């Protein structure tokens, strides 16, 4: 077994387990997360060409789907005759409305999907959330600060993390082709960085949940279940859309359901009841477990296919 396959098989879950068990010391390293993420994205973006980054009709479909699920889920839950219905509705809203994760292109690359389509969507979705997020939450929630301040926060929080590694990768491709070829040859770098990053993200998420002590136990359990259910719904819807449009289940699936939990948690704490952000934290843990399972399944399928080819050629 190669080192790369070993890390795909065991390193991902080991990273998740480490983040849960050692969340206190690892959460201290949380300020490193944006920089580690940008480094990981740099290696991923080195594999695509500038001409591949462009708007596509599916991007608009994804944005509309996201908003419909968010508002539909909110109003469906908001008027249920149960305690804390408004908090649960806010949690559902944000689990659907949350912008796509900047790391989505990395996972898509590991799973063999279209990095270009998802990278384009990360930028487009960020720009759309800058406008629609504060407007929707200003309507349904209790905003802190002006609309322009909220839009600026989302812009500063997301766009540089994507654009800096993207422009750096394209600049090296244009000016330093030899270096670009060397970087491109390091195809497994994203995996190694992701394993390290995953432990930090999980630790930061667990630390956040541990700090939320003001909610009753039943409410916390329901909020965690909301994170799981909305994760499964978007996973299933995204996979189905991807199969229908692209003939494969990876690209659009990841674009719809892999979320930027840090931005979402900030939006909840700025506009809604802060306890609702427990759902988003739980969503982050579930999506990373799903991602690890997907990578392992994809790797094992590739190994089986390679063995089958070798047997046929022999």
Residue spans of the language-model regions?
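Alpha-helical transmembrane segments of multi-pass small-molecule/ion transporters
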Residues: 1-314
């Amino acid at each position: 077994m190669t080192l790369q396959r070993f890390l795909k098989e065991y390193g991902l879950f080991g990273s998740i387990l480490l983040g849960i068990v050692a969340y206190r010391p690892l959460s201290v390293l949380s300020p490193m997360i944006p920089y580690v993420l940008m480094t990981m994205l740099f290696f991923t973006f080195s594999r695509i060409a500038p001409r591949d980054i462009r708007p596509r009709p599916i991007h608009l479909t994804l944005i509309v789907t996201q908003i419909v699920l968010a508002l539909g889920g909110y109003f469906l839950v908001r008027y249920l005759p149960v305690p804390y219905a408004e908090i649960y509705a806010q949690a559902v809203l944000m689990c659907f409305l949350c912008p796509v994760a900047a790391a989505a292109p990395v996972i898509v690359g590991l799973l063999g999907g279209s990095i270009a389509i998802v990278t384009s969507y990360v930028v487009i979705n960020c720009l759309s959330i800058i406008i629609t997020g504060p407007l929707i939450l200003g309507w349904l929630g209790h905003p802190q600060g002006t609309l322009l301040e909220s839009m600026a926060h989302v812009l500063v929080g997301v766009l540089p993390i994507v654009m800096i590694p993207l422009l750096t990768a394209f600049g090296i491709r244009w000016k330093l082709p030899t270096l670009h070829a060397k970087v491109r040859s390091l195809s497994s770098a994203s995996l190694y960085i992701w394993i390290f990053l995953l432990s930090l993200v999980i630790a930061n998420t667990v630390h956040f949940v541990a700090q939320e002590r003001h909610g009753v136990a039943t409410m916390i359990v329901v909020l965690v279940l909301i994170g799981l259910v909305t994760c499964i719904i978007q996973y299933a819807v995204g996979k189905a859309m991807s199969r229908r449009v692209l003939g494969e289940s990876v690209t659009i699936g990841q674009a719809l359901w892999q979320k930027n939990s840090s931005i979402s948690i900030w939006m909840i704490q700025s506009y809604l009841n802060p306890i609702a952000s427990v759902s988003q934290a739980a969503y982050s843990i579930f999506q990373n477990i799903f991602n690890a399972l997907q990578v392992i399944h994809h790797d094992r399928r590739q190994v089986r296919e390679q063995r089958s080819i070798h047997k046929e050629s022999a």
